[in-house]
Amino acid sequence: MCGIVGILAERQVAPLLLDGLRRLEYRGYDSAGLATLVNGHIENRRAEGKIDNLASRLEREPLPGTVGIGHTRWATHGRPTETNAHPHVTDKVAVVHNGIIENYRELRRELEEKQHRFQSETDTETIAHLITDYLNQNMSPQEATAAALKRLEGAFAIAVIFVGHKNLLIGARRGSPLAVGYGANDNEMYLGSDALALAPLTNRISYLEEGDWVELSPGKAIVHNASDVVVERKIHVTALSGAMIGKGQYRHFMLKEIFEQPAVIGETLASLVDGQGRVALNDLPFDWNSVPRVTIVACGTAYYAGLVAKYWFEQLARLSAEVDVASEFRYREAPMPEGGVALAVSQSGETADTLAALHYAKAQGQKIVAVVNVPQSSIARLSDVVLPTLAGPEIGVASTKAYTTQLTVLLCLAVSAGLARGVLSAERADAIMQCVREVPSMINHVLRDEHHIQELAHHVAEARDVLYLGRGLLYPLALEGALKLKEISYIHAEGYAAGEMKHGPIALIDERVPVIVIAPSDGLF
């Protein structure tokens, strides 16, 4: 997932852009680059690999300028090379881009027939030449951008700077998030893929809506909707700060976030209960007794949280629950019951497939509930109810604290549903919530055994294949454990329902395959 930063200021922006890109490293990337307007023309610096490589190049070849854009790229169209890295530059513009332009081949052929010369294999360069083509027709930067946006098909966010316009920075979004930042210095304005990239610069953020494009000038943002009508977008004051995003005493962000779990689970739980520790959610715009089914849509780790929630809704609320991978659900055209609830789970609140699934569910008349870590996100804005996880910024690529806070919210929601439907007694609900209140201290107890966990990890690290097994509620945990091992160690791992081991997986097990069984003391073990 790529990252965008754009800055318009009165000071040199290259160091600020580089710092913003470092804050977007968690999104994953294989190359990075910057472009600024220098003495009336555009200069750029790009590098393969780590941002440190780009920083080294900037030390050798400094990049002045008071307006600029930066990008971290994860290759989709074209190999991860310096030539394919962003920004892409013509004699009139520089462009950075997240997402995919689906009709770039047709546009590229059209532009090549007009003698536009392409240097890269990317779809992004097509945007730069398309805007340039409209500029060559004597359009203004704003007119050229609006015209180009109408030709582009796909999901994307872009940022553009223009030769001869040192006080102009344009951004646009369609299916990919883009935030506008307002500087403490009234003359500074910012663009970012998310608020994290802008955290050290400002806490005043507005989020572009689907189809919006924005023109930034000193101290001013003019937002246009998809019909090019000027609109207002609310400015939010975020709680993020540069200090919150540091690694502190930890070697890497994921380890830091693992150790933050007790605190953030406690904070999330405190937001969902009253003074007696009982679930106390805000009024919901539906009656649980009239809900025929809950449809949970999510991706990756959030999907596994949804699988756990399915068990809770069925067992605690006696309510039918369906869980779907959002990337599959959005294309299935599944029938949805009248009066149903669609529940979206997403750390960022910007997961494109989950957002598309919710648009479908909303069109089917479902009430939308969002469990997200970013209350101002696109998914949150689309929803009827937002139940935030208070995990704080999650920088590590592999989700940890967001997952456990999602489970906290989902359990409280299922308990609330069970009580409302009259199928869960107050006594049992109190007992469940007492157990939940003990979770932070239990996690602390496990984390104190870090040395033993490291010893076990050394044994697993030598394996080529690992099997995770669980039953009931813990089957989704087995799936999540296998996903984490794959993400972090690149060791092949699979999660299975324990009862299914004899139906295939057992044939692959020998003395070299570790089997990790999640086996608590319950009715199944």
Model-found features: residue ranges?
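Conserved short alpha-helical segments that host acidic/polar catalytic motifs at enzyme active sites
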Residues: 1-247, 251-252, 260-292, 426, ...
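Generic beta-strand/beta-sheet core signal
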Residues: 96, 161, 172, 181-183, ...
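Short, solvent-exposed amphipathic alpha-helical segments in soluble enzyme
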Residues: 20-24, 85, 113, 174-177, ...
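Short gly/pro/ser/thr-enriched loop/turn and capping motifs at secondary-structure boundaries
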Residues: 117, 124-128, 178-180, 198-199, ...
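Active-site phosphate/pyrophosphate-binding segments
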Residues: 261-265, 269-295, 364, 385-516, ...
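Glycine-rich oxoanion-binding loops at beta->alpha junctions
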Residues: 66-83, 271-286, 309-345, 351, ...
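Glycine-rich phosphate-binding loops that contact phosphosugars or nucleotide phosphates
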Residues: 289-438, 518-525
